[in-house]
């Protein structure tokens, strides 16, 4: 499943070059992932209460074009891989006209509250976490 979340670039996210600072894209990606999890009815609060966390372990970002103040951006997120302990999201940040600003591959894993890798508890596996095979 793909999910798209929309946001508008705010002034404090722009740097001295008047475009969105590259570090801000990490926040946009996090926003997109959380909106994706809400959309697939993933029980994020429940998994935390059960003593498990989903940690981002690696992000590759490919910057394609600049975004500027008041640009409306769409953050599209989809599950690309899912294993027993970890998974990968593919994310794209684009302007409303389709111009891609950034693409990212985000690897995450499930860990216990002690920080040890763990299988994703079955009760938290939702269909939306499964990659589309189309």
Where are these predicted regions, by residue range?
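Terminal targeting signals and extreme-terminal segments of soluble enzymes
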Residues: 1-74, 80-134
């Amino acid at each position: 499943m793909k999910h798209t979340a929309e946001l508008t670039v705010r002034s404090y996210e722009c740097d001295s070059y008047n475009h969105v600072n590259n570090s801000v894209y990490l926040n946009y990606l996090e926003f997109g992932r959380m909106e994706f999890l809400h959309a697939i009815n993933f029980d994020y609060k429940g998994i935390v209460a059960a003593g498990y966390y989903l940690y981002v372990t690696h992000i590759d970002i490919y910057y394609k074009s600049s975004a500027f103040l008041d640009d409306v951006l769409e953050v599209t997120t989809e599950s690309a891989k899912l294993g027993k302990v970890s998974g990968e999201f593919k994310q794209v940040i684009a302007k409303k006209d389709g111009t891609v600003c950034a693409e990212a591959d985000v690897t995450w894993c499930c860990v216990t509250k002690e920080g040890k890798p763990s299988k994703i508890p079955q009760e938290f596996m939702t269909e939306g976490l499964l990659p589309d095979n189309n």
